[in-house]
């Protein structure tokens, strides 16, 4: 993939960009096999990859520069701003949005936040696109509510210029730290969630809920989990760290009992809406800590699916799952190193299947799906 930003030395986020896609994929497979070398694997699935450019459905842009000439992109460690509006990882539809946002920032008087001076209002722009209909969600991350009414007043013009904008919010992040968002979300449009669909499963993207950034590969990941689970005798499953319910909703059947647990209330609201749209009556989503939920249960499900953050599922949940001993565990991970460590804590299980999903081209990162069966 060619990238003018990389060639000019302005961005090094895609550290593997000079390697051909096949070479990147082979290196990731080697890394995964090395991490699981001490754990016998029954079946290695063929790695899954997607487009090498224009695959991201989300842009997280630091806003810098001046109110008259804002820059949207990132800051180097020395504070030097870099405009990333022409990043080839974004879909072509984003370019028109970025072009419209720069003069809008000036019209609305949203002074970019200056980290060194601790002054200004607009910290980030967070843009997400649905592959279902091209609809967009735009979040303005502000230091305070000082410019909120100016933003409201100017917004109708932006919505008229960009009719694909379906959800717009202001997020208040008052802390002088590199934190992407604060706790308070203020909706500026009537619509509060972006409609999405993978493999015929309706999903909803809300402002403060995690959603995969590579829709093509994420769709394949969910479909694979569905195929694995539905081939097993599963009547009751848990989906821990469930997010908006992508895994559980793909796996669930009308007869199956599914319990989905996620700490973020916004994500649970999305999951419940999807379950209702699918007509699933034996599905229960709750906004709880996954470890606290699991360790407080007595009944043992047939299968537990976990999709934890990069740090893994943690010692307490590892020990509890080992003690509880469900017949099957499906582990989806964006950090194979912590996954391998967690699986090493389950001596009573064997790895039946493993498959790599190249969710993050041009980097060393990848997603991996593993099926474990109790011995």
Swiss-Prot record:
Main function: Catalyzes the formation of 5-methyl-uridine at position 747 (m5U747) in 23S rRNA.
Family statement drawn from the similarity comment of this UniProt entry: Belongs to the class I-like SAM-binding methyltransferase superfamily. RNA M5U methyltransferase family. RlmC subfamily.
What PROSITE patterns does UniProt report for this protein, alphabetically? SAM_MT_RNA_M5U, TRMA_1, TRMA_2
User: Which keywords has UniProt assigned to this entry?
Assistant: 4Fe-4S, Iron, Iron-sulfur, Metal-binding, Methyltransferase, rRNA processing, S-adenosyl-L-methionine, Transferase
Q: Tell me the residue numbers annotated for binding [4Fe-4S] cluster.
A: 3, 11, 14, 87
Binding residues for S-adenosyl-L-methionine, per the UniProt record? 212, 241, 262, 307
Q: Which SUPFAM superfamilies match?
A: S-adenosyl-L-methionine-dependent methyltransferases
Please tell me the species this chain comes from: Cronobacter sakazakii (strain ATCC BAA-894)
Mind telling me what this protein is named?
A: 23S rRNA (uracil(747)-C(5))-methyltransferase RlmC
Active-site residue list: 334 (nucleophile)
A molecular function (GO) term: rRNA (uridine-C5-)-methyltransferase activity
Where is the chain membrane-spanning? none
Taken from the record, one Pfam family name reads tRNA_U5-meth_tr
């Amino acid at each position: 993939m060619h990238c003018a930003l990389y060639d000019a030395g302005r961005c090094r986020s895609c550290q593997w960009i000079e390697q051909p896609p096949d070479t990147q994929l082979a290196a990731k497979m080697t890394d995964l096999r090395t991490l699981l070398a001490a754990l016998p694997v029954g079946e290695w699935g063929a790695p899954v990859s997607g487009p090498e450019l224009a695959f991201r459905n989300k842009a997280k842009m630091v806003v810098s520069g001046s109110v008259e000439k804002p820059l949207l992109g990132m800051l180097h460690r020395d504070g030097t701003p870099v405009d990333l509006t022409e990043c080839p990882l974004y879909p072509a539809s984003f370019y028109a949005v970025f072009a419209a946002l720069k003069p809008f920032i000036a019209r609305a008087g949203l002074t970019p936040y200056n980290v060194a001076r601790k002054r200004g209002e607009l910290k980030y722009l967070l843009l997400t696109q649905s592959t279902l209909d091209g609809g967009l969600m735009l979040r303005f991350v502000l230091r305070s509510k000082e410019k909120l009414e100016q933003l409201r007043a100017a917004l109708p013009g932006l919505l008229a210029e960009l009719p694909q904008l379906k959800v717009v919010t202001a997020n208040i992040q008052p802390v002088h730290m590199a934190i992407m968002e604060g706790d308070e979300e203020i909706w500026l449009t009537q619509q509060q969630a972006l409609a999405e669909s993978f493999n015929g499963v309706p999903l909803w993207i809300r402002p403060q809920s995690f959603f995969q950034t590579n829709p093509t590969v994420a769709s394949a990941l969910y479909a694979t989990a569905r195929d694995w689970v539905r081939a097993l005798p599963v009547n009751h499953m848990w989906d821990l760290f469930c997010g908006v319910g992508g895994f559980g909703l793909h796996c669930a059947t009308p007869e199956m009992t599914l319990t989905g647990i996620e700490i973020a209330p916004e994500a649970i609201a999305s999951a419940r809406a999807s379950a209702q749209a699918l007509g699933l009556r034996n599905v229960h989503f709750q906004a709880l800590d996954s470890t606290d939920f699991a360790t407080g249960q007595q009944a043992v499900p047939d299968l537990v699916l976990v999709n934890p953050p990069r740090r893994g599922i943690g010692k307490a949940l590892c020990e509890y799952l080992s003690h509880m001993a469900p017949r099957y565990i499906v582990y989806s991970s964006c950090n194979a190193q912590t996954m391998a460590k967690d699986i090493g804590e389950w001596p009573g299980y064997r790895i039946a299947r493993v498959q790599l999903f190249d969710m993050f081209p041009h980097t060393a990162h990848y997603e991996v799906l593993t099926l474990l069966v109790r011995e």
